[in-house]
Amino acid sequence: MDLLKVLSQMILFLLFLYLSPLGGHSYPLGSPSQSPEQFKMQKLLELIREKSEEMAQRQLLKDQGLTKEHPKRVLRSQGSTLRVQQRPQNSKVTHISSCFGHKIDRIGSVSRLGCNALKLL
């Protein structure tokens, strides 16, 4: 073979190896070591877990501090939410106007669509 031809083929082969994406970044399957991307993801997951635990502890301390400082305020707010939850059950529903027949008005009152308006007393 011609020396010039062999030299040009070797240069092309080395250039191909240099530019190939599998150059030095290949990781065998099932290797005990982690890839850099997996390592970064593990670090991020650990950081997120730590932050969420810190936030949960802060919220718990805040809630405990709130109940120690203002127990009456908390009880009032709980009582008002109870009243709000009980109101629709105890109130009477009356029809203000009727645009369509009785069956359509009943469907409109359930879906709250149409011209049938409900008034809570």
Swiss-Prot record:
Feature type site, description Cleavage: 76-77, 91-92
A cellular component annotation (GO) from this entry: protein-containing complex
Signal sequence extent: 1-26
Disulphide bonds in the chain: 99-115
A Pfam cross-reference name: ANP
One function term, GO molecular function aspect: hormone activity
Modifications after synthesis and translation: The precursor molecule is proteolytically cleaved by the endoprotease Furin to produce brain natriuretic peptide 45. May undergo further proteolytic cleavage by various proteases such as DPP4, MME and possibly FAP, to give rise to a variety of shorter peptides. May be cleaved at Ser-91 by the prolyl endopeptidase FAP (seprase) activity (in vitro). May be degraded by IDE. During IDE degradation, the resulting products initially increase the activation of NPR1 and can also stimulate NPR2 to produce cGMP before the fragments are completely degraded and inactivated by IDE (in vitro).
GO biological process: one example: response to oxygen levels
Taxonomy, superkingdom: Eukaryota
UniProt feature, compositional bias: Polar residues: 77-89
Family annotation (InterPro entries): Natr_peptide, Natr_peptide_CS, Natriuretic_peptide, Natriuretic_peptide_brain
Region called Disordered, residue ranges: 61-89
Keywords: Disulfide bond, Hormone, Secreted, Signal, Vasoactive
Family as reported in the entry's similarity comment: Belongs to the natriuretic peptide family.
UniProt-recorded name of the protein: Natriuretic peptides B
Organism ancestry: Eukaryota, Metazoa, Chordata, Craniata, Vertebrata
Name of encoding gene: Nppb
